[in-house]
Amino acid sequence: RHIAALLVNGITIHNFYVPAGGDEPDRQKNEKFDQKLNYLSEMKDYFYKNEPKKSILVGDLNIAPLPEDVWDHKKMAKIVSHTQVEIDHLAAVQRAGNWVDVTRKDIPAKKLYSWWSYRAKDWDTSDRGRRLDHIWASADIASSTGGSRILREVRGWERPSDHVPVFATINL
């Protein structure tokens, strides 16, 4: 799903939901994984044809691209959301739009998650999260962004989502 809005100040907001991709990271065995990769290819093609200017991209991209975006890079390397093929597809989208990962621009080195499984009984102690939710800015406005934060504590609320809010400040 892709929803875009042009604001009165000339900023375009793109909100994406990238399909989760099922449980098996194999295009031939898992139609959902194939659909996810095809969707990412369509995103890439869209941004090659429509170069983003004065744009923000937000959403659940269902990919944790960096080793610091998952609780254990080696254990997660064959798990949907952190496989190399997904990471490569997401990087191609990022290159196509010349997007800057605002959250990682602000918080470059530490483990950072926006999602924890409902299956984890003690999600906070085990801390087996993933950073699936992203905020990107087009290169022309990326320097106007900052103050990124992820509200981890929201995951501990009564009846929470498995995702938590991700914020950034954009001064334009």
Feature map (PLM): residue ranges:
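Active-site regions of metal-assisted phosphoester/phosphodiester hydrolases
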Residues: 1-172
